[in-house]
Amino acid sequence: MRVLKFGGTSVANAERFLRVADILESNARQGQVATVLSAPAKITNHLVAMIEKTISGQDALPNISDAERIFAELLTGLAAAQPGFPLAQLKTFVDQEFAQIKHVLHGISLLGQCPDSINAALICRGEKMSIAIMAGVLEARGHNVTVIDPVEKLLAVGHYLESTVDIAESTRRIAASRIPADHMVLMAGFTAGNEKGELVVLGRNGSDYSAAVLAACLRADCCEIWTDVDGVYTCDPRQVPDARLLKSMSYQEAMELSYFGAKVLHPRTITPIAQFQIPCLIKNTGNPQAPGTLIGASRDEDELPVKGISNLNNMAMFSVSGPGMKGMVGMAARVFAAMSRARISVVLITQSSSEYSISFCVPQSDCVRAERAMQEEFYLELKEGLLEPLAVTERLAIISVVGDGMRTLRGISAKFFAALARANINIVAIAQGSSERSISVVVNNDDATTGVRVTHQMLFNTDQVIEVFVIGVGGVGGALLEQLKRQQSWLKNKHIDLRVCGVANSKALLTNVHGLNLENWQEELAQAKEPFNLGRLIRLVKEYHLLNPVIVDCTSSQAVADQYADFLREGFHVVTPNKKANTSSMDYYHQLRYAAEKSRRKFLYDTNVGAGLPVIENLQNLLNAGDELMKFSGILSGSLSYIFGKLDEGMSFSEATTLAREMGYTEPDPRDDLSGMDVARKLLILARETGRELELADIEIEPVLPAEFNAEGDVAAFMANLSQLDDLFAARVAKARDEGKVLRYVGNIDEDGVCRVKIAEVDGNDPLFKVKNGENALAFYSHYYQPLPLVLRGYGAGNDVTAAGVFADLLRTLSWKLGV
C-alpha cells in the first residue's frame, strides 16, 4: 500500500486533475494506492474570507462567485476531456454544497459570529468536493473506488480548528472497514472527527498531516507528498535561485527544517511517519519523472553534512532579566507556563550561563498577548525591581542551519557566523540544540533573505558571485566590459558568477540584476532613459538582496568620487582607476577607509598608480610586513614616458607630443598630462600609502611647460604653439646627453618626506634611465630593499592594461567568500 497526497496546486484545474488521475493509475499498477486530496488552489482561502467578511458585515459574494466559478470550470473541463465523467451528478453535488455554504453564512450573519465548530465545517468543504470529483474521474476510467470518511474513521482530540489524530484508535476503525484489495482508496485531507462524532480540522498543512496519519494507520510502504516543486531543496529556491535539490534526508533533519520554516512539510506531518518508520517521498505533480526527495530513517553517508537552511520571519523576542533570576528555582518554568496558558508557541529559547537572563522568540502576531501574559505572571517581581522591565524586540527572523553531519564536522558554525558577519548582518541571539543537528540565529527581519543567501553560498560552495556596476563606459570602462565578455567561460570554469548588473555614462543608467547582455549593452544604454542615481543602485541592492555588489568607477569625475563613502556604507565594494578620491582631502581619505572597514567592504584602487602594474598591492604588502619606505623615485606617466623617450631619439618636443596624442597616450587635451598634476596625484597616493599626512597642495610641481609659455586657447591652437618650445627642450636634452644623462619626468619622495614632481636628469646607474616608450617604472628604496631598490616596471598607460588591473581588483572582492 502506498499513500499519495496531492496539494491544492496539483488539483487546481481540469488538466492537473487528470494528471493526478494518471499518476494514481500508474502507481496502482505496482500495488494498491490510497489518495488524500486538498481543496483546489484558492478555495480554502475563499472559504476563510467568506466567514471573515460575513462576521464583519462585508460582502462575501465575490468570494462565493469566484469559488463557484473555479468548480464550474473544473467540472466543465473534466467533462470535455474525460469520457464517461458524471457531469450532471457532480454538478448537482457541488451546487448542493454551495447552497449549504450560503445557508450557513446567512446564519453567521444573523449571529454576528462564527462558532469554531461551524468554522471547521465550512473551511473543509473544498476537500470534500475534490474527493467526490476524483471519484467520478476514476470510476469513469473503470476503477473501483472506496472513499474513507475521515470524520468517521479518524478520531482526533483537541480544538475544533487544530486537532491531533489518535492513530491507534483510527487504525482500528480503518481496519474494520475491510477495504477490498482491488479498490483505489480516496480520503479528504484536513478533516477528522472528535469523540462526539463532530467534524474537526487538523490545522495548518492539515492535508499533509492527514496523509501521514493515513499512511501510519494503513502501515503503508511509503507516503508520497505530491506538490509543485521537485522535492526538498537546500533552501527556498525563491530566495536562492541555485539552491540544490536534496536526494534524501533523515526524519530528524526534515523535522528541524520544517520547524524552522521550510515550506515542503509541516513538523506534525513527520511525526506519524517517523513513529512507524514509513519512508516519505516528496514528488512534483508537474514533473513526475523527477526522483524527488526521500525522507527516511537513515541518510546516505555521502550526502552533505548540512542539508538545508531555513528561515522564520516576523518573530518577536522577549528577554527576562534581573537579579531576581539568579538562583531562583522555577523561573524558566513560570515563563513557559505563562506562554502555555496564553496558547502561544515558543519558537526559540536561549539562556545565559550566569542565569541572569532568559530570552525566547514567539510569532510577531502573538507579541501583544505574550507581553500581557508575562506582565501578569511577573507582576510582583517587576514591581519590586527583582526583574528589569521586559525587553521586547520586534521584526526579527530566525535563520537555521540543519544537518545530521553537523554533529561530526567541525567548523560549520564558524562558516555560518562568518558569512553573516561579512554581509554586515548583526546576530541578536544564538541557539543550538543538544543533538547538534541544528544551529539557529536571530537577526533583523530585513536581513533574513540576505542571510540565507550568504549562508547558502558559504556552506554549499556554489558559484561565487560578483555583481558589477560600471560607471563610465568610455576608454577604460569599455575595455573592461570587453574583457569581462571575453573571459566569461574562464570565470565559469572557476565557479565565478560575474554579472554586469549595471552600466552608466553621463547621460543614462542601464540595469539588470540578472546580468546585462554584454553583446549589445551599447545599444541598450543608448536607449536607456534613466539618469545615473546613487539611490537607485542602493534600492536595487536592497530589493534583490545582492550579495557582492561592486561599483567600478572608470570616470575621472570628482562628483562620483565624492560618493564612494556612501557606496561603501551601503554595502558596495568600490574598485576604481579614478585618482580623485584618494587625492581629495585627508579627512575624506580617512572617511573612505573607515567606511570600508566599518562596512566590511573593500576599497580597491591598484590602478590609481601604474595602471595594470601591481603597485599599490605590493607596497601595502611591504608595509604590512614591517618594511618602511626611505625614499622613492618613479616615472608615473605613460604619456610623459613616451614623450621624453622620443626626445632621447632626437624628435622635437612638439612632434613627440603630437605623436603621443595620436597614439592615444595623452588625454584629448595634452595640457592635462603636461601640467604634471596627474603625476602629482599618483605621487600623493603613494605618499599617503606610506602614512604621510599630505594634501595635494603639499606636492611641489614643476610642470613640463615653462611658466612663461602661453598655453591658452583651444587644443588646436595650443598644439600649433608647441613648436615654440622645441629649441628649449633640444638644448636641455643635449646638455643632459653631454653629461651621460637623459631627461625624465620623475616623481620623488625624499628621505625627509618631501614630495616633488619635476623634469630630472638621470644617469646610467639610475633604474629610470632606460624607461621610455610609455613604460612606467617605480623604484622603492626601503629598509628591506637597499642599496638596490625594488623596481616595478611595465606599461602604465592604455585602456587595456588599466582595464586588466581593474579586472584583477574585481576578483579580489571575492576574498570575503574565500576567507583570504
Swiss-Prot record:
Question: Is Kinase among this UniProt entry's keywords?
Answer: yes
What GO MF annotations does this protein's record show?
aspartate kinase activity; ATP binding; homoserine dehydrogenase activity; identical protein binding; metal ion binding; NAD+ binding; NADP binding
Region of interest (Aspartokinase), ranges: 1-249
Give cofactor(s), names only.
a metal cation
Where are the stretches annotated Interface? 250-470
**GO BP field:** homoserine biosynthetic process; lysine biosynthetic process via diaminopimelate; methionine biosynthetic process; protein homotetramerization; threonine biosynthetic process
CDD domains linked to this entry: AAK_AK-HSDH, ACT_AKi-HSDH-ThrA-like_1, ACT_AKi-HSDH-ThrA_2
Function of the molecule: Bifunctional aspartate kinase and homoserine dehydrogenase that catalyzes the first and the third steps toward the synthesis of lysine, methionine and threonine from aspartate.
Its recorded name reads Bifunctional aspartokinase/homoserine dehydrogenase 1
Q: Which organism is it from?
A: Escherichia coli (strain K12)
